[in-house]
């Protein structure tokens, strides 16, 4: 069976989103263990998805996009990523956003 290989890439915006959520959990909720657990879950979910990046339903956006967005659910959060396939020999899973599930995502994704 043919298996695609994806290279992993992150946008700075993803790190900003993640830092914002982790900082909130640590500083406002006073729960560093929960923040650390969330980081572990996020890393694990991304690494598990990497070999199968295009095997899930794309996110249906009202805007036309060059690359389809995909989602990974982690607790009450959603990781958004795209697969950049401009070069079939260099497929990139680019992780773009980390948003709270209750956030208005209309103009964020």
Tell what function each PLM region has.
Residues 2, 58, 86-89:
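Inter-domain helical "communication" segments and dimerization helices
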Residues 25, 29, 53-54, 102:
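A general structural signal marking secondary-structure boundaries and capping sites
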Residues 1-43:
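Arg/Lys-rich, positively charged N-terminal/basic patches that mediate binding to nucleic acids
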Residues 44-73:
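A short, surface-exposed loop/turn module that caps and links secondary-structure elements
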Residues 42, 49-50, 81, 95:
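Conserved short aromatic-hydrophobic micro-motifs
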């Amino acid at each position: 069976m043919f298996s695609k290989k994806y290279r992993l890439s992150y946008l700075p915006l993803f790190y900003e989103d993640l830092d914002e959520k982790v900082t909130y959990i640590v500083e406002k909720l006073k729960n560093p263990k929960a923040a650390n657990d969330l980081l572990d879950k996020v890393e694990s979910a991304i690494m598990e998805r990497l070999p199968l990046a295009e095997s899930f339903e794309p996110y249906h956006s009202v805007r036309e996009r060059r690359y389809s967005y995909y989602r990974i659910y982690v607790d009450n959060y959603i990781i958004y990523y795209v697969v950049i396939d401009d070069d079939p020999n260099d497929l990139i899973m680019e992780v773009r956003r980390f948003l709270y599930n209750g956030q208005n995502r209309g103009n964020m994704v």
